[in-house]
């Protein structure tokens, strides 16, 4: 409970002059050595009717002098108990400390308010159960470097604690203490600073890490080069442009950066270096972009740096496109408003040679490729499976399919490819009924293209049709064979004519 005097003192905001010195003293509003004190609002104190101080500063001074009554008064005026403890520590007023410390209970709450390292240490000692490690940890939090300067030697040999404090200082970004620990104590894992710098994206911390590393090794040290390379890879992977530039100050290869920048589509990094590197490197980057399935903007940036000229490495490019099944660059070159570069057929040929049916169909849909073109390529490359599947999909009607396959044979020069298509036609006719006209047309077609075995098979089938018309057809085929020196076709036609003559009544 407050006394009547305390209630008066707590709530008195009136001027003190009319009260006289005696009343002021009786009210406890006189601060010995300083003069009268008056409350000004909730946060300030007027001393001797002249000086205005923050209440927490006033209670700190009063506590340092050991003036318990004035301390009590200022606490009534919403002064801070924590600053009272600080003042008592400054004046070594242990009676006051003993009286008020229990109301706080934990000295660590006060530490951030203390600027003087000696008082800081005294405050920490109030908790008798605390260790040196606790003192150092709070010194890091509160940037109290003098604590390390005073007791740092006690850490020598304690590798675990040194590492713990070093990493804590890095996480809290306390650069002064990081420097002191790094240069004065043996930190067995200095590189921990870089991991923390990457996570916090703190370039100052990152630069400080190199300063500490270079205190131990030179830039030509193999270990240092390995560290730089790892940093460049990670920084460029994450798109940390400033970190990349910082690492390159100490060494490393720009190529390392560029390949990661392409892979992860960091165009800011790429644009900074792209015009400073040789064409051969750009070509490798484009191939890497295909492998990494880079974005449209990344491809355009790379291609524009070589003016979209891909001829010198077009074979490698096509190989990469087909191998990694990524066709964006083909599309970009085709979409150019001027000087289009059409690699659709070239890529298609490699796809037909090496890829699966599904991959080829996807490409056909993407670039609106005519099925005939694919079937003819498949025939040249002896891809029987593709001929069958693609022609079946393109022309469901069997007679329609035969018609298109015949057209392809007529326009092909590749002998083996033509034969393969004709055998495909023959396989279709094996389970398709042909009328007289269709059967005769197909027989003549085989004769024109010197398909001896197929011609013989069709001749056998044609005997079921009108013999007179068939004989006329055979004479046409014989004429064709003689004109082109198709000896086996001529022999077969001649034999069939003789047989018809033999069995036909005269």
Swiss-Prot record:
Which residues span the membrane? none
Superkingdom to which the source organism belongs = Viruses
What SUPFAM superfamilies does the annotation carry?
Answer: Ankyrin repeat (SSF48403)
- Entry keywords, A to Z: ANK repeat, Early protein, Repeat
The stated induction of this gene product is: Expressed in the early phase of the viral replicative cycle.
Q: Where are the ANK repeats?
A: 54-83, 253-283, 313-343
A Pfam family annotated for this chain is DUF249
Which InterPro entries does this UniProt record tie to the protein? Ankyrin_rpt-contain_sf (IPR036770), MGF_505 (IPR004858)
Q: What does this protein do?
A: Plays a role in virus cell tropism, and may be required for efficient virus replication in macrophages.
Q: Which family does it belong to?
A: Belongs to the asfivirus MGF 505 family.
Please give the name of this protein: Protein MGF 505-9R
Organism per entry: African swine fever virus (isolate Warthog/Namibia/Wart80/1980)
